[in-house]
């Protein structure tokens, strides 16, 4: 097993590395993860997406290697677009307890269908 495969396989989301946020100002962190992959729970075919993470930290920030490894754990999981983005959102919201957070999954088209899933802490039902 190669070292990257080993790191992904052994990654434990319960021990995701987070750091204290020492900044006194409010600010937004924007992270783009352009190589997200999961497998369709129906067909098993791979689905690819770019994940856009934005959050206003409170007391914690996520360490960048930790978010990379966490995202890579989805690589061989059979999970829907909706479930994967909601899981990422809930995990980061629970771990970081940010003042505000948004996670967007912009999935590559498959079968002429383009899906974008967005979860955000200030979600309002559209009228």
Curated annotation (Swiss-Prot):
Functional pathway = tRNA modification; tRNA-queuosine biosynthesis
Active-site residues are: 40, 47
Q: Does the keyword Oxidoreductase apply?
A: yes
| Intracellular or extracellular location(s) | Cytoplasm
Q: Does the keyword Lipid biosynthesis apply?
A: no
Q: Which reaction does this chain catalyze? A: 7-aminomethyl-7-carbaguanine + 2 NADP(+) = 7-cyano-7-deazaguanine + 2 NADPH + 3 H(+)
Principal location = cytoplasm
* GO annotation, biological process: queuosine biosynthetic process; tRNA modification
Describe its function. Catalyzes the NADPH-dependent reduction of 7-cyano-7-deazaguanine (preQ0) to 7-aminomethyl-7-deazaguanine (preQ1).
Q: Family assignment?
A: Belongs to the GTP cyclohydrolase I family. QueF type 1 subfamily.
Protein name, entry field: NADPH-dependent 7-cyano-7-deazaguanine reductase
Gene source species: Campylobacter jejuni (strain RM1221)
């Amino acid at each position: 097993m190669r070292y990257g495969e080993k790191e992904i396989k052994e990654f434990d989301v319960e021990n995701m590395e987070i750091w204290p946020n020492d900044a006194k100002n409010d600010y937004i962190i924007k992270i783009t993860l352009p190589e997200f992959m999961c497998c369709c729970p129906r067909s098993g075919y791979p689905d690819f997406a770019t994940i856009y993470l934005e959050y206003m930290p409170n007391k914690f920030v996520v360490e960048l290697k930790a978010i990379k490894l966490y995202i890579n754990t989805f690589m061989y999981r059979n999970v829907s677009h909706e479930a994967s983005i909601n899981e990422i959102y809930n995990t980061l919201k629970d771990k970081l307890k940010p003042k505000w957070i948004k996670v967007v999954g912009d999935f590559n088209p498959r079968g002429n269908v383009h899906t974008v899933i967005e979860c955000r802490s200030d979600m309002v039902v559209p009228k």
